[in-house]
Amino acid sequence: MAMSLCPLLLVFVLGLGLTPPSLAQDDSRYRQFLTKHYDANPRGRNDRYCESMMVRRHLTTPCKDTNTFIHGSKSSIKAICGNKNGNPYGETLRISKTRFQVTTCKHAGGSPRPPCRYRATPGFRSIVIACENGLPVHFDESFFRP
């Protein structure tokens, strides 16, 4: 029994070594993007929502000045990276062809240390992102057209 597992284990270990490091890093950046900017089904979109989400997503040490949460499906956000739901925007960014429900949380001022106070701005707009290997990895907060 142990002898029959050795070839399988060898193939598995060799396969791990052949996984491109860039692929693993890209997936990590995508997961980080989701943590910072994705919330499929928000419960309320007010100041309290922003304050709890920013703490829950570890964006308050120090208090992040601005962060936007996208409310939609992961597949529709990923589609911005291709031609299905996205167009080129500037040199390296993509703009969505469709509008997304979003909540933008802005730091209300005061100390950059917790507890952080945020003001919520709910909206419905196009979003601009950066993509790597077909995955969103950065949300452009400077694009704020309704």
Curated annotation (Swiss-Prot):
GO biological process, one term: cell migration
Regulation of protein activity: Has weak tRNA ribonuclease activity by itself due to partial autoinhibition by its C-terminus, which folds into a short alpha-helix that partially occludes the substrate-binding site. In absence of stress, the ribonuclease activity is inhibited by RNH1 in the cytoplasm. In response to stress, dissociates from RNH1 in the cytoplasm and associates with cytoplasmic ribosomes with vacant A-sites: ribosomes directly activate the tRNA ribonuclease activity of ANG by refolding the C-terminal alpha-helix. In response to stress, the angiogenic activity of ANG is inhibited by RNH1 in the nucleus.
Active site: H37, H138
Localization per record: Secreted; Nucleus; Nucleus, Nucleolus; Cytoplasm, Stress granule
InterPro entries: RNaseA (IPR001427), RNaseA-like_dom_sf (IPR036816), RNaseA_AS (IPR023411), RNaseA_domain (IPR023412)
Sequence positions that bind tRNA: R45, C105, I127
Enzymatic class: hydrolase
Disulphide connectivity of cysteines: C50-C105, C63-C116, C81-C131
EC numbers on record: 3.1.27.-
Location, primary (coarse class): secreted
GO CC annotation: actin cytoskeleton; angiogenin-PRI complex; basement membrane; chromosome; cytoplasmic stress granule; endocytic vesicle; extracellular space; growth cone
SMART domains from the UniProt entry: RNAse_Pc
Residues found modified as Pyrrolidone carboxylic acid: Q25
Domain of life, source organism: Eukaryota
UniProt motif (Nucleolar localization signal) ranges: 55-59
Signal peptide: 1-24
UniProt keyword Secreted present: yes
Keywords of this entry: Angiogenesis, Cytoplasm, Developmental protein, Differentiation, Disulfide bond, DNA-binding, Endonuclease, Hydrolase, Nuclease, Nucleus, Protein synthesis inhibitor, Pyrrolidone carboxylic acid, Secreted, Signal, Stress response
Reported function: Secreted ribonuclease that can either promote or restrict cell proliferation of target cells, depending on the context. Endocytosed in target cells via its receptor PLXNB2 and translocates to the cytoplasm or nucleus. Under stress conditions, localizes to the cytoplasm and promotes the assembly of stress granules (SGs): specifically cleaves a subset of tRNAs within anticodon loops to produce tRNA-derived stress-induced fragments (tiRNAs), resulting in translation repression and inhibition of cell proliferation. tiRNas also prevent formation of apoptosome, thereby promoting cell survival.
Subunit structure: Homodimer. Interacts with RNH1; inhibiting ANG ribonuclease activity. Interacts with PCNA.
The protein's name in its UniProt record: Angiogenin
Source organism per UniProt: Equus caballus
